[in-house]
């Protein structure tokens, strides 16, 4: 019963907060707040810099592989478990999947800087 009350209160509170957050920002929209600020002067040019999508994709790929490699760091401590063959097989499969992902990115030229 306590779990049901907790879930109901949490759901109601979440719904209320999401509703408030959805409707509240639409009250005060000023064009001056949305424009870029250059020490009180009118902007000379657009403040939006061009962003390289290739850089973004390489960065995301790096973060994914870095996170997956970080999952391999506790592997030496896992070797102290009584069933080392299962640990070795799981780690070998994990590294194989990483290698396949890297090969896929490489063959599709996802790691190339220039085209």
Curated annotation (Swiss-Prot):
Primary location recorded for the protein, binned into one broad class: mitochondrion
Q: What is its EC number?
A: 7.1.1.2
One GO cellular component term of this record is:
mitochondrial inner membrane
| InterPro entries for the chain | NADH_UbQ/plastoQ_OxRdtase_su3, NDAH_ubi_oxred_su3_sf
What is a single molecular function from GO for this protein?
Answer: NADH dehydrogenase (ubiquinone) activity
Give its localization: Mitochondrion inner membrane
Q: Which UniProt keywords apply?
A: Electron transport, Membrane, Mitochondrion, Mitochondrion inner membrane, NAD, Respiratory chain, Translocase, Transmembrane, Transmembrane helix, Transport, Ubiquinone
First-level EC class? translocase
Give the catalysed reaction(s), semicolon-separated.
Answer: a ubiquinone + NADH + 5 H(+)(in) = a ubiquinol + NAD(+) + 4 H(+)(out)
- Ranges annotated as spanning the membrane: 4-24, 55-75, 87-107
Q: How does it sit in the membrane?
A: Multi-pass membrane protein
Q: Which GO terms describe its biological process?
A: mitochondrial electron transport, NADH to ubiquinone
Q: What does this protein do?
A: Core subunit of the mitochondrial membrane respiratory chain NADH dehydrogenase (Complex I) which catalyzes electron transfer from NADH through the respiratory chain, using ubiquinone as an electron acceptor. Essential for the catalytic activity of complex I.
Q: Which family does it belong to?
A: Belongs to the complex I subunit 3 family.
Q: How does it assemble?
A: Core subunit of respiratory chain NADH dehydrogenase (Complex I) which is composed of 45 different subunits. Interacts with TMEM186. Interacts with TMEM242.
The protein's name in its UniProt record? NADH-ubiquinone oxidoreductase chain 3
- What is the native source organism of this protein? Notiomys edwardsii (Edwards's long-clawed mouse)
